[in-house]
Amino acid sequence: MNTNSRRITHGFTRSPNRAMLCAMGYDGADFAKPIIGVGSGYSTITPCNAGIQRVVDAAKAMLARHGAMTQVFGIPTISDGISMGTPGMRYSLVSREVIADCIEACACGQSMDGLLVVGGCDKNLPGGMIGLLRANIPGIYLYGGTILPGYWGARELTVVSSFEAVGAMGRQGMSIDAMREVERHACPTTGSCGGMYTANTMSASFEALGMSLLYSSTAPSPGIEGELSISTSARSLINAVRRGIRPRDVVTHRSIRNAMAVVMAVGGSTNAVLHYLAIAAAARSALSLHDVELIRRRVPVICNMKPSGLHSTADLHSAGGVPRVMHELALAGLIDESCLTITGRTIGAELLAAHRKRHGSTVVLPTNMALYRTGRLVVLSGNMSRNGAVAKTSGLSILLHSGTARVFRSEEACVQAILNGCVRIGDVVVLIYLGPKGGPGMPEMLSPTAALVGMGLGQSACLITDGRFSGGTWGLVVGHVSPEAAVGGSIALVRNGDFITVDLRNNSLHLHIDAWSLAARRAAWRLPCTLCVEGLLRKYHDGVGQSHNGAIAA
């Protein structure tokens, strides 16, 4: 079991190495045990991660009980919710790469035999999974848990309620006192943001991927069921180390398709598309936007989840969690049940053993009673997005929108224009130079999209960007436009007053301009001299690829 760690614990030449370990309280028989690393995302930066320390402490004790020498190391986190709408949001997607680097460096640099990664906020999940795949030693992902819903009177709240309250204030639909009440009650506990936003989308999909245990990803952060997941995850990891089951044995093209099927079924975040493109690359597998679109067309939405729907992730957990979702998909032949999981059993065997609760619940619907017949993450292409774009259509009553472009080069100017009433029904807001290189860091545009919803324009105005969207975004939005503006993509050539059509039925994003005029604009285009970054952002800018390939940093 200690195939890797024996390099530092065995033989007389490793006496100095063992001396260092003795200072950490290890001795004698410990040196024959496997070294299991616990990557801890604990942080008091954000409620998403503030409850993780107790998870890490319990996991460390459980692993030791099962015969491991356990070593805890830290992984950083950026709070998307707190950095939203600020220059700090540029570091959010960058942190996915930093987290993966940290995990790979510690696991490989310290000759670990296994890995348990514990995370909470959005980029902890894809960053952790990419790190597990790069290290490719037996590993498992353990989620820190979801936050419980907040309440203001009878109204159920999430953090997105606060963002939308800002827009409501802009149209004088809410008083300052009411906004502050929403602010005070939106986040009542620790845990990741409580709708089917990015963190909960990714954690739910990790169950289908086979890298997290069934029913472990939807449990509220403060709860007994989370403690049970810790125990079973530790036991499963030791078994994987014993049997030599590695992440790349589990994460394959077929299991990634299972994960994306769950993303579609729960009405998940657009970020899942970006992250699974990167996860597939780390797994040495293949996934394209075309694959994502094919999955979308097959898989119905069977959960009416926030942000556009009614239910929180805690509601989904009470209704049977991801196993219940996967059971419904499996009945319709939409899950490949032969895929291996980190337990050593197939996903079909795991589903058979899983306890599925409340079959009468309306939180998870049978596929023949689906909320939508197809997934709501639509891949678009056209003369504005030669390499693709991703639209989220949950909660929309319109699938075709044509309107006049309002072009902005900064999120701040865009939000101010929306709140000042300068964006009207039918407009197409175009936010440019916010892609992987242009941001740099491809920041999320929750503030402008929430402002549109709060101003009553969620169904009647459209927002298009080469940046990203929060999992809390809903409305008529198109992101991940590739090529991005900063590399001369067509989105950089859009001008105020241009006419744009978003056709979700025909997967089209079209700028109404003749080819000659578009070519003339392209010939005249020059990159604006506005980018002035250094350090980590400069390194990211110089090495990052385009969003249609997962925005992977070299």
From Swiss-Prot:
Function: Functions in the biosynthesis of branched-chain amino acids. Catalyzes the dehydration of (2R,3R)-2,3-dihydroxy-3-methylpentanoate (2,3-dihydroxy-3-methylvalerate) into 2-oxo-3-methylpentanoate (2-oxo-3-methylvalerate) and of (2R)-2,3-dihydroxy-3-methylbutanoate (2,3-dihydroxyisovalerate) into 2-oxo-3-methylbutanoate (2-oxoisovalerate), the penultimate precursor to L-isoleucine and L-valine, respectively.
Entries under Gene3D superfamilies matching the protein: IlvD/EDD C-terminal domain-like (3.50.30.80)
Amino-acid positions noted as binding [2Fe-2S] cluster in the UniProt annotation, renumbered to this chain: 48, 121, 193
SUPFAM superfamilies listed in its UniProt record: IlvD/EDD N-terminal domain-like, LeuD/IlvD-like
Protein residues bound to Mg(2+): 80, 122-123, 444
Cofactor, how bound (note): Binds 1 [2Fe-2S] cluster per subunit. This cluster acts as a Lewis acid cofactor.
Residues with N6-carboxylysine modification: 123
Recorded metabolic or biological pathway in which this protein acts: Amino-acid biosynthesis; L-isoleucine biosynthesis; L-isoleucine from 2-oxobutanoate: step 3/4; Amino-acid biosynthesis; L-valine biosynthesis; L-valine from pyruvate: step 3/4
Recorded catalytic activity of this chain's protein: (2R)-2,3-dihydroxy-3-methylbutanoate = 3-methyl-2-oxobutanoate + H2O; (2R,3R)-2,3-dihydroxy-3-methylpentanoate = (S)-3-methyl-2-oxopentanoate + H2O
Subunit structure: Homodimer.
Entry cofactors: [2Fe-2S] cluster; Mg(2+)
EC number(s) reported in the record: 4.2.1.9
Biological process, per Gene Ontology: isoleucine biosynthetic process; L-valine biosynthetic process
Family as reported in the entry's similarity comment: Belongs to the IlvD/Edd family.
Name of the protein in question: Dihydroxy-acid dehydratase
Active-site residue numbers: 470 (proton acceptor)
Superkingdom classification of source: Bacteria
GO MF annotation terms: 2 iron, 2 sulfur cluster binding; dihydroxy-acid dehydratase activity; magnesium ion binding
Pfam families in the record: ILV_EDD_C, ILVD_EDD_N
Organism: Tremblaya princeps
UniProt KW keywords: 2Fe-2S, Amino-acid biosynthesis, Branched-chain amino acid biosynthesis, Iron, Iron-sulfur, Lyase, Magnesium, Metal-binding
